């Protein structure tokens, strides 16, 4: 990165020196140089809001060309734009202006190349995940999974990157699902010091729904972690894995003791979320044949999936709202 700054803080602007000079600005300016192509997610967000209203909770971006993400280190990713919720393991912050939003936007999801996803959104293709499960995890990162337990320094529930559930965490508890899109697994206690993962990545668990503001704390069943397990907490969800260790029971009160209660509570929290599905093409190119139809199929199925995965407690809208 090459730039110049007047000192003492102030605004910062990225430029394309070849195309945008001369320019008059009041703060620092710079241009970023790289040895390989990348995606400017904030530029995508700003471009979107130049034509559409600031009336979206999530922007969900798909690329119509091959592109590695984060140097090949991610299949898809999410980054938070704004958080005002307390008691979910996240700081309070607002970076909306950088994304072109002055109010509602909370999350940016980068799904990567559309071509790497199966045409059938319910086909399992990435470990135990379908396209809908991947989308469930990435949009779910707006709230999940960052909870500590017992006290604010205990990450026993957490696995990969401290933002997914621990493989050894029975993330569904006694709930109706087979694990959580946020990882962890549905674990059977064999009663002899061994445990077996019996299901995984199946929508949102009761604990997830509590964190999302869709379920009161009183409706979250007890859960447990297999303490001392030989399985890496960051391991990808899998079915049929045997673990050995001690059962450590967890209640929602143990989590609230560490994080405090969720504010706003489920009684006052948002239940309907608007998400924009965005297809990005290379400059000057039309979408690939079939891409728009494929993405629209995903969009339509996602609205159904989200409602099902939240046990009918949450709703997604995907309509476009012009400025």
What are these regions (language model features)?
Residues 1-135, 139, 235-323:
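Zn2+-dependent metallopeptidase catalytic core
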Residues 203, 215-247:
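Short linear, low-complexity motifs centered on an aromatic residue
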Residues 1-4, 12, 108, 207-210, ...:
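A broad "ordered helical/assembly scaffold" signature
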